[in-house]
UniProtKB/Swiss-Prot annotation:
InterPro entries the record matches: AAA+_ATPase, DNA_recomb/repair_RecA, DNA_recomb/repair_RecA_CS, P-loop_NTPase, RecA-like_C, RecA-like_N, RecA_ATP-bd, RecA_C_sf
Family: Belongs to the RecA family.
GO BP terms: DNA recombination; DNA repair; SOS response
Subcellular location as annotated: Cytoplasm
Species: Campylobacter jejuni subsp. jejuni serotype O:2 (strain ATCC 700819 / NCTC 11168)
SMART domains: AAA
Key words of the record: ATP-binding, Cytoplasm, DNA damage, DNA recombination, DNA repair, DNA-binding, Nucleotide-binding, SOS response
Protein task: Can catalyze the hydrolysis of ATP in the presence of single-stranded DNA, the ATP-dependent uptake of single-stranded DNA by duplex DNA, and the ATP-dependent hybridization of homologous single-stranded DNAs. It interacts with LexA causing its activation and leading to its autocatalytic cleavage.
UniProt name for this protein: Protein RecA
Gene Ontology annotations for the cellular component aspect, listed alphabetically: cytosol
Keyword DNA repair assigned: yes
Sites where the protein binds ATP: 65-72
Any GO MF annotation of the entry: ATP hydrolysis activity
Amino acid sequence: MDDNKRKSLDAALKSLDKTFGKGTILRLGDKEVEQIDSIGTGSVGLDLALGIGGVPKGRIIEIYGPESSGKTTLTLHIIAECQKAGGVCAFIDAEHALDVKYAKNLGVNTDDLYVSQPDFGEQALEIVETIARSGAVDLIVVDSVAALTPKAEIEGDMGDQHVGLQARLMSQALRKLTGIVHKMNTTVIFINQIRMKIGAMGYGTPETTTGGNALKFYASVRLDVRKVATLKQNEEPIGNRVKVKVVKNKVAPPFRQAEFDVMFGEGLSREGELIDYGVKLDIVDKSGAWFSYKDKKLGQGRENSKAFLKENPEIADEITKAIQNSMGIEGMISGSEDDEGEE
């Protein structure tokens, strides 16, 4: 760059710093790009699939899927992990359906959790913006986008048409929120539901998420949560096998996926993941129905081995570290070749 151009650019940069504050615009070569901070998900596999050890801080996240697929359970685990690291969390319960006892079972410190049950969508998003702008809250969860009903729709008559109101509300709110959460390093997670597209036929997925397209574009990470099997013991259902696909990721390679057990009343089974990934990486030995780690037998059968690890957390922690050391943060879970055509 010649001297005249450089002087003009320096003058423009000084003007921007004076108007908007120092660091408004930086040349990447002048400062090493900082490692993106993250909040753990409570799942070893999903942390690895996300590429940075969890969901990124200072970003908007969307977690979506069918009903009873494990979306709220996953977000409660993320809240618990954030609190363990000393973070402050807020839960915007637009569905008015938060089960406090279940949240406690999952490790959430409900005494320190800030909860709001807004009456309409504008109020919910105003609350999110206000507490995000404070800079004192690390994680905000909104459950769910489908329940963010505009005030005009609530106050109107039953048969009134309110086409596109919710989509416009979300678009307006997200335009404001994106800059705020980045500046304040606050993570905002929107839980969303799926709907069938009207008139969809022939090609592409017939499913879509509620609230218009704005969240798809503004979200740095989008997670698709699906139940893939029911777990049974003596023919009695005891939980679900859940698959999470990272369908969008702006902070690491997308299209990776993770599977884990969600046990009824207990939430995500960390022990089940340790056995699965331990066997996959030859950290845990499997001989017939028996599982063992080093010279210690964990148990006969997967459920017995899970119970052993639950009773011996020091061994579970040792296996966790071995898995993390073996896989690292970059090389983690193999992506699904079938997912390359997804968003």
